[in-house]
């Protein structure tokens, strides 16, 4: 394979803005006052917030295709790459568990799933798959997983219910979490990063690998943009059609959800590539590049600093609520005040990210 892409600045920017968006929606000034687009869907449906996690898995897939194609072209031993993949996956997973233990380090209530553990699993499976299969095989595997998940979820009755259920808390994926998931679960009896839903989440990474293969092809830049947009459009359209029988749902990562969000990610990558790498647009993209240079570190920093802003009590009230009350005292509507705080929090996280970027400190797990 010819590697015509040396460095996709557009991918760095997309990664950074995705992380910034993740921090923005995770840390509002007041969780009771949040604009609907900045909230996850309660169950079925899709909000802009629902797109963030699959975007990051998609970006992981693109990065795998670019990074490991270069290493294969250099003739590096696969055995060495396997070791590094396993070690990196373990590190990302371990950091995720560490964040789950904060602030009390209560091992009896440990949560074994979450954003970083899922990223670790998707990275591990996708990277090993990429080193040992061609893109067509990867596409077939991804499609097979989605079809199998669809059939399992829509044909196998939930034990104890006597019929197929796709509702919250009583579907097969949630039942499996309740029966077999160790430790604490995010929703008490089930987890949005649960056991069964992890399989289709791997396909979000596979879709990114396929996009990465496209970016590495000998096609012209213009043709790459066209293909990204066309593929993305048809994936999104097909996903919503699939959603008529298997609803678009982030909580159980339905097959239709994978298609819709992967399609949007294809189009987003095409837009970023056109604007940044083709047209050289730098205005407004630099913050994304800075965030993207240390994406996981920035994510971890957001969680750790939250202990201060959400945990430290001054006068019986947390710092975030002091900011929220100050903004509302200025006449802001509660939801606007909550969003302004979230933007301010992203800006605070940006400061150490900028310092690391300027000093060329890039922390790679």
What are these regions (language model features)?
Residues 1-365:
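Alpha-helical transmembrane segments and their immediate juxtamembrane cytosolic regions
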